[in-house]
Amino acid sequence: MLRLLSKRFYCKIATKSNEKATKLYFKQLTHPTKVPQTPVDAEFPDTSASEIQIDTKTIQLLERLSLVDLDSERALATLKSSIQFADKIAHINTDHVRPLYTVLEHQQLQLRNDQVTEGDCRAEVLQNAKVTDEDYYVSPPGNIPLEQ
């Protein structure tokens, strides 16, 4: 395996960066941070009491776009609970919350230079696919026939 990694240039870079990577010491992260150390109770309206109504046109559109069969009661219940959860999240007040870019605020992330190391390897990549058509991957269809 090591011989295989040493042949490819991008694998050499990956193994070198792993050797140079420093360990994260979580005990060092005791500094003041924007992330609260204990959960904060958020007050937002409970929307679980309101019944979600979904018409058949919307269900058919979702089935066609997502290739998921929503005929069963269990699938509809899951869809309705997902909508209620999204509605709860939409009502959370985030007026005075600054955006968080990384949880490790005071620790630098090691990034490598973005360099193209290998190119024009379409044939090698397409060898990994089970089914191809005109130099494209063919993905298996979902549980709904595409003839609709």
Swiss-Prot record:
EC number per UniProt: 6.3.5.-
Single GO MF descriptor: ATP binding
Chemical reaction(s) catalysed: L-glutamyl-tRNA(Gln) + L-glutamine + ATP + H2O = L-glutaminyl-tRNA(Gln) + L-glutamate + ADP + phosphate + H(+)
Assigned keywords, A-Z: ATP-binding, Ligase, Mitochondrion, Nucleotide-binding, Protein biosynthesis
InterPro entries, per the entry: Asp/Glu-ADT_sf_sub_c, GatC
GO cellular component, one term: glutamyl-tRNA(Gln) amidotransferase complex
Subcellular location field: Mitochondrion
Example GO BP: regulation of translational fidelity
Family: Belongs to the GatC family.
Summary of the function given for this chain in its UniProt record: Allows the formation of correctly charged Gln-tRNA(Gln) through the transamidation of misacylated Glu-tRNA(Gln) in the mitochondria. The reaction takes place in the presence of glutamine and ATP through an activated gamma-phospho-Glu-tRNA(Gln).
Further comment found in the protein's record: This protein may be expected to contain an N-terminal transit peptide but none has been predicted.
Subunit structure and binding partners: Subunit of the heterotrimeric GatCAB amidotransferase (AdT) complex, composed of A, B and C subunits.
Protein's name according to its UniProt entry: Glutamyl-tRNA(Gln) amidotransferase subunit C, mitochondrial
Source organism per UniProt: Drosophila sechellia
Lineage, opening ranks: Eukaryota, Metazoa, Ecdysozoa, Arthropoda, Hexapoda
